[in-house]
Every structure is written in structure tokens, then in C-alpha cells.
A protein has these predicted regions:
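Conserved GNAT acetyl-CoA-binding A-motif
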Residues: 85, 91-103
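Conserved acetyl-CoA-binding loop-helix of GNAT-fold acetyltransferases
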Residues: 71, 77-90, 110, 114
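Conserved catalytic-core motifs of GNAT/GCN5-like acyltransferases
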Residues: 98-101, 118-134
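Accessory recognition modules or surfaces
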Residues: 78-85, 97, 131-140
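Acetyl-CoA-dependent GNAT
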Residues: 2, 6-68, 72, 85, ...
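Short acidic/polar active-site loop segments enriched in Thr and Asp
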Residues: 62, 95, 118
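Active-site acidic-Proline motif in GNAT/NAT acetyltransferases
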Residues: 58, 72-78, 103-104
Length: 141
């Protein structure tokens, strides 16, 4: 059974182990720590093991923004990213929820489109040669 909950400081080490980017990007560890301490990080757990996580903030021009969404490869294609995004939609305190992904990340683009997100813009130069595609969903309250 997969459960969703707020991340706790005790989860930070497991989150670092879960996310391969934390090995190559020195900014990831402080980001995960800050997101956890500010209660913006939510984790998915199965049999006591962290299998995915995401970060929802409200700092994108005062709108909700899913800054990060990650599911371990062994647990992909099981609708867990969908479940996490819907969880964030329910928690979002604004009428619009934004998120983004690299142009190279076709599965994330397909996920956002399937969930009713619309392309809202492009940010160049974050990752060289791989623009960031911004998505928005208007939430009904």
C-alpha cells in the first residue's frame, strides 16, 4: 500500500538516496532540506520505503508551483505521479497551479497534459540546450 505524507527531517537522508540528482547537483541537498523544514515536501511511502516525492510551494508570483516531482523508476507507470499531482492540486491555496519540466522529459509533458495542464511558457538557459516548459492548470474551488 502506498501512502502520502509530509516529509519529516528524518526523511532527508532517504530522500537524498532516492533522488539520483542529489549525487551530481550540490544544490539538491539544501533544497530538499529547506523544502522539508518548510513543510513543502511530500513523500510517497510503500512498506516503509520512500518511493517518490514532490515539492509544492506558493512562491511563483504568489501562485502554487510544483517545483519537483520524482518517482523511483521501479514504481513508475503505476499512476503514482498522477496521485501526487492530484494531492498537490487539493493542497494548492491559489486558483492556478503551475509546474514545469524540461523539453526532453516527454513522460512529464504527457502527464501534465493528461491532467489538464496547459503550456504557459518557456524558460531558456536553465539547463543548456534543454528549455524548461512551464505548465498551468486553473483549479476549480
Amino acid at each position: 500500500m502506498v501512502t502520502l505524507r509530509l516529509a519529516k527531517p528524518a526523511d532527508i537522508g532517504a530522500l537524498m538516496d532516492l533522488d539520483p540528482v542529489s549525487v551530481t547537483d550540490t544544490r539538491r541537498a539544501p533544497f530538499i532540506g529547506q523544502a522539508t523544514r518548510s513543510r513543502a515536501c511530500h513523500v510517497m511511502e510503500s512498506d516503509g520505503r520512500l518511493i517518490g516525492y514532490g515539492v509544492l510551494t506558493h512562491n511563483f508570483y504568489q501562485y502554487g508551483f510544483v517545483e519537483l516531482l520524482y518517482v523511483h523508476p521501479d514504481f513508475r507507470r503505476k499512476h503514482l505521479a498522477t496521485r501526487l499531482m492530484r494531492h498537490f492540486e487539493g493542497l494548492c491555496a491559489t486558483e492556478k497551479l503551475f509546474t514545469s519540466t524540461n523539453k526532453s522529459n516527454i513522460p512529464a509533458q504527457q502527464l501534465f497534459t493528461a491532467l489538464g495542464y496547459e503550456r504557459s511558457g518557456v524558460i531558456e538557459n536553465l539547463d543548456e540546450g534543454d528549455p524548461e516548459l512551464v505548465y498551468v492548470k486553473r483549479l476549480t474551488r
